Amino acid sequence: MKTQTTHAAEQHAAKQRWLNAHEEGYHKAMGNRQVQMIAIGGAIGTGLFLGAGARLQMAGPALALVYLICGIFSFFILRALGELVLHRPSSGSFVSYAREFLGEKAAYVAGWMYFINWAMTGIVDITAVALYMHYWGTFGDVPQWVFALGALTIVGTMNMIGVKWFAEMEFWFALIKVLAIVIFLVVGTIFLGTGQPLEGNATGFHLITDNGGFFPHGLLPALVLIQGVVFAFASIELVGTAAGECKDPQKMVPKAINSVIWRIGLFYVGSVVLLVLLLPWNAYQAGQSPFVTFFSKLGVPYIGSIMNIVVLTAALSSLNSGLYCTGRILRSMSMGGSAPKFMAKMSRQHVPYAGILATLVVYVVGVFLNYLVPSRVFEIVLNFASLGIIASWAFIMVCQMRLRQAIKEGKAADVSFKLPGAPFTSWLTLLFLLSVLVLMAFDYPNGTYTIASLPLIAILLVAGWFGVRRRVAEIHRTAPVTADSTESVVLKEEAAT
């Protein structure tokens, strides 16, 4: 029995060495300061700065509770990802872990679903940039697609720079986002604490009871809203991808992940609670940042414009992060055969430029959407982005569970940074993600149509697999086979034939 366990551990170690070879070519240039801010900035994006306006209209004060629920499960997902990162840091993130624990088919599905997430998220971000620019009346007559194309050009160029420059830019982008929220929290708390009226109206808890209570539209709209709020946390897993280019991921990643949970509570829940205590929830509008709405009503010259510049930066930051992620995820998939061979190419600056360019091509579709249906593009694309992130998070949880199993069986070394309450919290998180899919079906028409598109996505994934499986088989013919990996055996047999 001991001999079998030792043999299984040796096979698993051999596969890890093969997977680690996929990381060659990256420049380990990210420091602790940058990783910390990337983790924080990943949790603060367009979903809060722009999406919160429409969400307050739909759920009222209950939005704070929705953010809290989603935030707790986001923390579980981050801790699960942290386990995987300490097991084996990888720029391929959970796609590489899916390849290790679930096989190449799972890595193929995980990778392309994550690509769907970031492809859709990028379209949301360039749409957000265009909407923010229309805040200024001077640009009111400029078509939305022009700003979308401009944002795409700027960020696409930035992503071709080396990772050190990306990390530094993302640090400052994230810092601006954090400072914006902190300034709002300080100014809003002063107004609330001193009892100063805002636009002639008193602030305080009465604004909740005077405007329909905590659930002004009932419980069901608040529950359905969970599927939209999930998008607000869609970048938290960025820290997993960044771990592959960290100087010391074993120390940096746990510290960064543990800092996220209380910041989610402060920035998301605290901000929404403060927003509804300062103004009636129905004073906020879809299409305009609620923070811009608040500062504009202070009567201070240019404060609304300054805040609008901040949230514009947030959208560009999210777009920048998306291109960073997809370039590396597509390269990881290409190394395993699940994506075209050219996507594995690296530039002299150690940047996976081919994957980034492929993503930019998809983002151009977003520019056309801004031209064709500018008023609906944000909500249409938001649902598809949520679908992609739900699938990605589910793969993270399943891989974490398989890692625990491998550790228990002696195939992998134990890790010091673990998901609290696992496996209960692992199963609970998977149940939560499944419930989000169910809730999406009730969000008619966009959510309903998104769920209805699942069979089409499944057909496309199956068709795509038949297109790549020969290359996958060729690559896996020389890859180590773990004791429990029947898929690799099948792939090798296919390659032999």
Which residue stretches match the model-derived regions?
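Extracellular loop-to-transmembrane helix junctions
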Residues: 26-30, 50-147, 157, 260-263, ...
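Membrane-interface "cap" regions at the ends of multi-pass membrane proteins
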Residues: 1-53, 57-62, 75, 79, ...
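C-terminal membrane-solvent junction of multi-pass transporters and transport-like membrane proteins
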Residues: 343-353, 393-444
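Membrane-interface loop-to-helix entry segments
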Residues: 144-202, 234, 257-261, 382-395, ...
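Hydrophobic, membrane-embedded alpha-helices of multi-pass small-molecule transporters
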Residues: 30-49, 151-154, 208-269, 274-275, ...
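TM-loop-TM module centered on a large, flexible mid-protein loop between adjacent transmembrane helices
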Residues: 96-98, 103, 135-139, 208-212, ...
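A generic transmembrane alpha-helix motif of multi-pass inner-membrane proteins
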Residues: 380, 384-392, 419-497
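Hydrophobic alpha-helical segments and their helix-loop junctions in multi-pass secondary transporters
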Residues: 176-210, 273-279, 393-410, 467-472
